[in-house]
């Protein structure tokens, strides 16, 4: 299962492998849990010619391409549907740390930035991994959207059994990210910035993306005719979807 609008490369990766993909409806808040539950509850293997779906691929934060961000309440609701139907969740979160300040309108005062690291961390929407009690979540993360786009370095977090299988697959597929990219990021994060420096960078990135988002939305408000166009100010990520 995937959102009805999703990252094209994710589809292009799994379809040649014979994976059957079904889409789940979305709204401005992302994937709709009721739509997912209805699909799974009424699944007819004979009519569909396929077994009941058992994996959900989702981009919860700053979704590509819609820009939608699932709220904490929605993530809990989707996780409960996954528990009900024994579905494994692949949580793709390259934009997780691009969560922005709330959009208050073109003529309103900006929301003050986080005062410290603790306030910044507290402001982040809980991930699926953080609410996982069954070991049914694999979280994908990346430095490509928040640090060095050309590094192509990321990491995965999940249960020991899943990670072991992931490692075995990597040994005969991609093997490892580029060694130069790994050492550059290691030197930056471990020897130069440290945890506090990285958090400072992420806070600065939030403010920068908030300014960019606000400029884009203001331009939409000023120049696009509301009779034929509509948009929602994204809470995270790189996309504004009409």
Predicted regions and their residues:
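Structured helix-beta-strand junction loops
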Residues: 84-85, 134, 169, 212, ...
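Conserved core of the PLP fold type I
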Residues: 1-86, 90, 96-131, 209, ...
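Conserved core segment of the aminotransferase class I/II
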Residues: 16, 20, 126-207
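Acidic catalytic patch
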Residues: 43, 92, 181-185
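Short coil/turn segments at secondary-structure boundaries
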Residues: 70, 102, 152-153, 169, ...
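A structural signal for well-ordered alpha-helical segments within the folded catalytic domains
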Residues: 76, 160, 179-183, 210-214, ...
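Conserved glycine-rich beta-strand-loop-beta hairpin in the small C-terminal domain of fold type I
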Residues: 202-217, 221, 228-242
């Amino acid at each position: 299962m995937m959102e009805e609008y999703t990252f094209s490369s994710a589809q292009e990766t799994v379809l040649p492998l014979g994976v059957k993909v079904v889409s789940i409806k979305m709204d401005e808040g992302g994937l709709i849990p009721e739509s997912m539950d209805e699909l799974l509850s009424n699944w007819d293997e004979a009519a569909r010619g396929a077994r009941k779906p058992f994996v959900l691929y989702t981009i919860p934060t700053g979704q590509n391409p819609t820009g939608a961000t699932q709220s904490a309440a929605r993530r809990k609701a989707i996780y409960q549907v996954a528990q009900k139907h024994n579905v494994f969740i692949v949580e793709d979160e390259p934009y997780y740390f691009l969560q922005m300040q709330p959009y208050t309108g073109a003529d309103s005062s900006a929301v003050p930035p986080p005062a410290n690291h603790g306030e910044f961390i507290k402001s982040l929407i809980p991930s699926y991994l953080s609410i996982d009690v069954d070991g049914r979540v694999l979280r994908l993360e990346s430095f490509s959207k928040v640090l060095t786009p050309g590094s192509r370095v990321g990491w995965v977090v999940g249960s020991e059994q899943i990670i072991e299988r992931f490692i075995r697959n990597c040994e005969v597929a991609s093997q490892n990210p580029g060694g130069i990219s790994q050492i550059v990021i290691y030197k930056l994060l471990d020897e130069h910035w440290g945890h506090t420096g990285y958090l400072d960078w992420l806070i600065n990135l939030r403010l920068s993306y908030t300014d960019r988002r606000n400029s884009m939305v203001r331009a939409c408000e000023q120049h696009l005719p509301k009779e034929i166009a509509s948009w929602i100010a994204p809470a995270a990520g790189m996309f504004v979807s009409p």
